[in-house]
Amino acid sequence: MSRPEQQFKKVLKNPQAQYAVYPTVKVERISTTEHSYFIATKPMFEGGRRNNVFLGQQIRQSVVFKYVSKKEIPGNEVIVMKALQDTPGIIKLIEYTENAMYYILIIEYIPNSVDLLHYHYFKKLEENEAKKIMFQLILIIQNIYEKGFIHGDIKDENLIIDIKQKMIKVIDFGSAVRLNEDHPQYNMFGTWEYVCPEFYYYGYYYQLPLTVWTIGMVAVNLFRFRAENFYLNDILKGENYIPDHISETGKQFITDCLTINENKRLSFKGLVSHPWFKGLKKEIQPISELGVDYKNVIT
């Protein structure tokens, strides 16, 4: 066994190796034109939609491998991630390779992080923390918009948060598409539970009102336990989805985002100037510049 492989197995034995990666997992080697990697053969997330994501390592830097089936998505995720490479708040694509069946994306690994769904698994967030998370998300989404793309699947699972620094990054660009804000869209690529009501009613939607709707859904769910996640059907049934314990401006933000009539919904460009976010700085500080030392991931 080579020394790099021994080092990687030390990472897998570390309790902070995250999720479903265990010390007994087997390790394989993958080579690209640029680097050679070791990869765990057990997914980071077992079951569900993300059993195609694996922890890996190149020399002394941990990375994440994502396998994208060529049958499902014709390389769009790679194209979008390359175009957004320098965008703050976006998970970075280090490089990619492919085989007969898959595009293999090699993505940066953020230590001490978890997806937002698991972050509020057993707790409802305090309003101030939730507000800062939502403001970061809006700034990141607007940066994506300015580059000419729409993420297409904004939800708790596609946001990771650095537990110590409370900074977030957007992941999973498998549903991302080119911005086409003036034309109706007839295909839905995102998660059905987060679909906007107009798609159910009319069979089409516009990209920006859909984005505002999904932002509102994320905001509601931050104030709930994971098992209580709220979806469109709950709203259409008339159930009260506004948290009682938050400020009036917080309640108004959620109401403005989750208005059934898309023409009365908060505008995409009006998100950042909503009174709920008064006093917050309009900047995104990358996690990688906040003290994360990838060389110290291996102990």
From Swiss-Prot:
Q: In which family does this protein belong, per the annotation?
A: Belongs to the protein kinase superfamily. Ser/Thr protein kinase family.
Q: Which UniProt keywords apply?
A: ATP-binding, Host cytoplasm, Kinase, Nucleotide-binding, Serine/threonine-protein kinase, Transferase, Virion
Q: Which reaction does it catalyse?
A: L-seryl-[protein] + ATP = O-phospho-L-seryl-[protein] + ADP + H(+); L-threonyl-[protein] + ATP = O-phospho-L-threonyl-[protein] + ADP + H(+)
Under which name does UniProt file this protein? Serine/threonine-protein kinase 1
**Gene Ontology terms for molecular function:** ATP binding; protein serine kinase activity; protein serine/threonine kinase activity
Alphabetized InterPro entries for the sequence: Kinase-like_dom_sf, PIM_Ser/Thr_kinase, Prot_kinase_dom, Ser/Thr_kinase_AS
Where, in this chain's numbering, is ATP bound? F45, E46, G47, G48, R49, R50, N51, N52, V53, K66
Q: Boundaries of each Protein kinase domain copy?
A: 39-277
State which residue ranges cross the membrane: none
Q: What is its EC number?
A: 2.7.11.1
Q: In the UniProt entry, which residues are flagged as the active site?
A: D153 (proton acceptor)
Q: What does this protein do?
A: Essential for viral replication. It may mediate the virus progression through DNA replication.
Question: What do the Gene Ontology cellular component annotations say?
Answer: host cell cytoplasm; virion component
The record's annotation in SUPFAM superfamilies points to: Protein kinase-like (PK-like)
Q: Name one Pfam family in it.
A: Pkinase
Question: Which EC class does it fall in?
Answer: transferase
Gene3D superfamilies for this protein: Transferase(Phosphotransferase) domain 1
Q: Could you tell me where this protein is found in the cell?
A: Virion; Host cytoplasm
